């Protein structure tokens, strides 16, 4: 399939209610169907595919002007703004260090803005409807994500084993104050060599990757009735000011607005990162 062929799960744009809100989180992918809010321009560390759920979506990528479609692709770490005349949208996150960008189909590899992919849009809405109908009886595993939405596994990126070890450490515990120096020592590289190799293998600086994974870990908490200051400390922010600033940079919304819009959001997935389970 991959943004192209028709699907037996195809569904049209339709009205949604709070019962349709869910988020499936895996270590390397996210499927979100829920409230959009009114996000300002922001930068996410994942490739994001926005899909129309109730109405067409409007996207402004890198201040290139507003464009409208059923599907938009935004590459990792590219500033953008998204809007919709309805309340609900779908967003799929693909963590870029897990895929070989050069081997992705053209519109995924090079798309940066709206694309013409009505069959894919209808298929994603069909997958969403199936998850809603199945409720808690739908047994989903991380390895099911790509085949469900794209028809096959996306091509994996080959990462230097030393950098892969660091990536795994950060993903397992994004709240840990792991410095570049510590990680360099862990994999027996000099500090400068580690920073160079990390950027060459992952595509972004170490600090940018760590910042995104910490902000991403917030997704595991958003439907909980928790004190935001406590959440900030749990996921590794030194104080509420840093927390609010980082989350607004990553999502275009204040933390309190994200939590307010997620009260009726159903989360499915593998649970919290290690640190949050302690």
What do the PLM-derived regions correspond to, one by one?
Residues 31-34, 146-155, 195-203:
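Short, Lys/Arg-enriched N-terminal segment that forms or immediately precedes the first helix
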Residues 177, 181, 200-238, 261-278:
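Terminal helix-turn-helix DNA-binding modules in bacterial transcription factors
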Residues 117-125, 146-178, 184-187, 208-226:
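A short, Lys/Arg-enriched amphipathic alpha-helix from helix-turn-helix/homeodomain DNA-binding modules
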Residues 104-133:
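Aromatic/histidine-rich interaction motifs
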Residues 190-191, 238-239:
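Short coil turns linking two alpha-helices in DNA-binding domains
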Residues 194, 198, 242-243, 247:
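Short hydrophobic/aromatic patch on the recognition helix
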Residues 16-109:
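N-terminal regulatory/effector-sensing and dimerization cores
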Residues 1-22, 126-131:
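A short, N-terminal "cap"/entry segment at the start of jelly-roll beta-barrel domains
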């Amino acid at each position: 399939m991959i943004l192209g062929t028709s699907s037996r799960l195809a569904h049209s744009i339709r009205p949604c209610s709070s019962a349709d809100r869910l988020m499936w989180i895996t270590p390397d992918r996210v499927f979100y169907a829920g409230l959009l809010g009114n996000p300002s321009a922001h930068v996410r560390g994942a490739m994001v595919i926005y899909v129309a759920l109730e109405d067409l979506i409007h996207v402004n990528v890198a201040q290139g002007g507003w464009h409208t479609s059923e599907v938009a692709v935004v590459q990792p770490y590219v500033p953008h703004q998204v809007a919709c005349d309805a309340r609900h949208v779908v967003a799929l996150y693909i963590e870029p260090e897990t895929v070989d960008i050069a081997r992705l189909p053209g519109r995924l590899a090079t798309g940066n803005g709206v694309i013409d992919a009505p069959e894919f849009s209808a298929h994603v809405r069909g997958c969403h409807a199936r998850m809603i109908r199945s409720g808690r009886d739908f047994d989903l595993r991380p390895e099911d994500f790509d085949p469900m939405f794209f028809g096959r596994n996306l091509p994996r990126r080959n990462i230097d084993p030393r950098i892969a070890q660091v990536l795994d450490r950060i993903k397992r515990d994004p709240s840990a104050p792991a410095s570049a120096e510590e990680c360099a020592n862990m994999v027996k590289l000099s500090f400068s060599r580690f920073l160079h190799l990390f950027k060459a293998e992952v595509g972004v600086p170490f600090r940018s990757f760590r910042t995104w994974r910490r902000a991403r870990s917030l997704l595991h908490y958003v439907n909980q009735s928790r004190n935001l200051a406590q959440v900030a400390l749990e996921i590794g922010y030194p104080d509420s000011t840093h927390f609010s600033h980082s989350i607004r940079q990553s999502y275009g919304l204040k933390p309190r607005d994200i939590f307010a819009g997620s009260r009726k959001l159903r989360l499915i997935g593998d649970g919290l990162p290690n640190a949050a389970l302690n």
